[in-house]
Amino acid sequence: MRRAAPAVDNRPREVNLMRKLRFFAAAAVALSLCVSTPSFAQARKDFKVCWTIYAGWMPWGYAKTQGIMSKWAKKYGINVDVVQLNDYIESINQYTAGKFDGCAMTNMDALTIPASGGVDSTALIVSDYSNGNDGVLVKGSGKKVADLKGQPVNLVELSVSHYLLARALESVGMSERDIKTVNTSDADISGAFATPAVHNAVTWNPMLADLKAKPNVTEVFDSSRIPGEIMDMMVVNTRTLHDNPALGKALTGAWFEIMQLMHGTSPDSQAALTSMAKASGTDLAGYKSQLSTTALFYTPQQALDFATSPNMPKIMTRVAQFSFDHGLLGKGAPNAGAVGMAFDNNVTVGNKNNLKLRFDPTYVRLAAQGKL
């Protein structure tokens, strides 16, 4: 599942412990790479990327099963294995530990796990942003965000659900001091909200769609109110990408071939969507409903325009501040700019001597120019 923090049974200290362990493990990996990598890296032939089930990432599975990924990899003389994992955070952990060359993840998680752990990472493709896929729910009719004041709110702490809640509170002049968060895993959120004791929750689709369809429930805020702030991306190890540009070309080419197919109206397009729906555990109507709140960039130009927007550094600065305020950039982080980020046109945010997250549109630009 997308954007799920570890299940910790309402014990936030364990969340922090897990993130600290990930931080030190990633730092160790980064250090080992620094001391053992030769000056002249030899081009590789075999690569692995991973993904987990989420509406906007189903194309990666389709790329594998239909041979589209293999076709593009063969074009550039390499092999790319696209591996589905069952646990979202575990997929990022494995990428951070060097077991995968790339991984599908959100912008906030890219910053707070691999990048803050010292693994230089590149957002190869910003594939979509949440446009209603994440929401804040309150039991009762006609409720508003202000009704959360003094109330417990169930959510996956330190995830983008937490970020969404903070933005919702901010929109009405409130802050997290006005509520109490109750850490609840994504697997438990639906069951918890069904009990009389739980009145408020923040979650994402498909759980969100199921819960807000229940009687006497109000969605008081959703991610369409903060367009572009919750991004879904394919993140690749920067050193690996630098040494093996064929990987970037193959992944990008395969992705946008599928985007073109999904956006069409032909029988082949419907068959592709039906296949993705089945793989995600729903039917075609259900999958299309999830896609309706996912702002997918169906063309390379759309993705390029978003990735090169002057708003990108502003959005990530806000995300970094939230991450720092919640201790997600590591214990020794002095400020929200501890982890440097690079954007198009040589724009940087944060520590320029510690650039660990890069929004590099090079390969999407090649796709937009028809050069892949």
Model regions: which residues?
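Bacterial N-terminal signal peptides
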Residues: 26-35
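Bacterial N-terminal signal peptides that target proteins for export
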Residues: 16-25
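Conserved C-terminal helix/tail region of periplasmic/extracytoplasmic solute-binding proteins
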Residues: 319-372
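Sec/Tat signal peptide C-region and signal peptidase I cleavage site
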Residues: 35-41
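Secondary-structure end/capping motifs
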Residues: 242-333
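Short, Lys/Arg-enriched N-terminal segments with co-localized hydrophobic residues
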Residues: 1-17
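Short, glycine-/small- and polar/acidic-enriched structural segments
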Residues: 42-183, 190, 199-205, 228, ...
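Pocket-lining segment of extracytoplasmic ligand-binding domains
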Residues: 188-284
